[in-house]
Amino acid sequence: PGYNHVSFAGYPMEFLGTDTVTISVGQQQFQQVIPLQATKNYQFHIIHHSHNDIGYSHLQTEVERIQTKNIIDALSWISNNEAIGEKAVWHIESLWAVENFLRNADEPQIQAFVQAVKSGNFVLSANYANVLTGLSQREELNWLVEYAKQLEKKYDILVSNAMITDIPGITHAGLENYTRNNIPYLSLGPNYVENLPDHGDRVGGVIKENGDQVFYWKVAPEAKEKLLVWTAGKGYSYFHNIQDNEKEAKWESRISAYVHQLESTHYPYDIVQLRYTKNADNGPVDTRLGQFVKAWNERYASPTLIVSNVDTLFALFEEKYGDQIPVLTGEISPYWEDGAYSTAVEEMENRALSQQTIAMEAYARKTSQWDTYSKDFYALHRNIILFHEHTWGSWCSISDPALFFTTEQWRIKKSFLDSAHQQYNRLSKHLGFNYVPKDAARTVSKSIISDFQVDLTTGGIAHVIVENMDIVGRENPYDLMEMVYSKGISPMEFSRSKNIKILHQEDSKDQKSIELSMELEGVKNMTIKYLWIKNTNRISCYASFDKMETFEKESMHIAFPFQTSDWKLAYGDEESMLNYPQDQLPGSNKEFICVSQQVELTNDSRKISIQAPAFSLYEVGAIIDETKVNGAKVWNREAAPTNPLFLYLLNNYWHTNYKASQGGHFSFDVQLDIE
């Protein structure tokens, strides 16, 4: 009695039709007619690696030791398997681990490492770490592959791929970074949790719409450079939490289920990318993988398992299916960047540091000082990148925020930012560099703006008169640039400003300004200043407040409602603007977009540009809804209305990794340009 799992010899691959299976239990017999259909002999190419969270599962210092040990263990595994003729391939998804290893390795270890890379037994991803591309400036993404270029030059090796693990989605600039740096292959292994509605934690449509999809990405259809992008259909974590004594049974079950899925969805290829991380994040090397694969292939005619190299896998796929691979452009708009705004003050600082470093680097090259300080720039780049690495804190950061394991991880995370500040200040002094923001509005002989008016019951702008027309939308409940505080998740409670007082106002021939103080839940000492310089078409908002710390779920937003509903939305920077939703690839985030520089709303008569240099995220159509379904947020699949927009200032909505509460002083500006 009870549940029994029985394996028996199957049928030859060529056998088709039906058969009857008879099961005898005591004196009873049960019969089941089984249809036998043609199936492909799938080749599952195992890409074995350890997902490198710099923190989360362990303190960052312990992760460094774990990943160094993994490299040493993998070198031993490769050496031992060569002796018995079994294939061993180990992938390193984050070169942070390689830099740590090489810093302390002896010469024989370094030689063994380089030889393993050249032989294809060690496969390096070009990424220094798994970063959130939606937080990063275009030039900053170059720093992500900077160490890979150093390794190539120093050891005469070639790094041909990038592996992004856990993170769902990648920006257009993130994709272009690889083509610009001549990296031909991108393996995406997003977060995967079978029993969640989207089959992953806050992954939106990435798994369901983009899993097992292969395409060439180009910056534009006519571009010559291309990137082969392949999302592993079961992410990177399909084999987590499997003990060695249950490996055979659970792999058989999960591979079988995967084959059925591939058949039912009419997967057009017979080659499958299968990411494999053992046990959990920052897991070990499976030194018995070769024996397991050999035993599997001796036991089963189909499917075949292969211990593979991601570079040779992608090359094999191109060779076999190259003429069938579609060419796409755009981005897989990402999802996890919202968590960074659980530490909004620090993220604003790192974003500013990135922008300032980009300008300082241009200055150093212009003044012929780059070569002298290139190592200092590398150290600065490294810390900015590490703050944008996707691991913000511990796995129990929300459930146990006061635990030393949690607070120490945040201390170390913040130390990357603190170190970057020190390095920037020291380097700018040596270079004689003073940063000047590029935020000056274009002057005009006569502004198309004739007036703006503030609503003293909301603190927002009620009217902006442009060529005798009011551009502020009145059907939306919020005024233009109004601050909105949201408490809770389901249902959300929205709070608006109150006790608004005028601190200063001016309306002269040169400018109109009004400075307000106000009260808003969750903050104190809030002041807002609106400014229109009358020989420009820009209205600026300068905000300052002190955030009060709370563990209750919360968020803050700035509203941008406009008249009419026919606005077209574009976002990006001066090099590239994307159209929402036309330039979003399948699986993209439709609820908020990641913006490097500005958003633009256009219709037949107007163009409105919004710049918020301190922030990355804009919610489209509505303030984000964090209602849970079976304990998880389910993301909208349909495009949202492009009006209104909301600048997403802060939140603590995550259930893990990011911070449970935040405080600190906020000071920032938002620029609204009208044409």
Language-model regions, residue ranges each:
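Short, solvent-exposed turn/loop segments enriched in Gly/Ser/Thr/Pro and often Arg
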Residues: A88-V98, N127-N130, A162-T171, G189-N195, ...
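Short, surface-exposed connector motifs at secondary-structure boundaries
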Residues: K154-N161, D270-L274, R538-S540
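Extended acidic/polar, glycine-enriched regions
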Residues: P1-F44
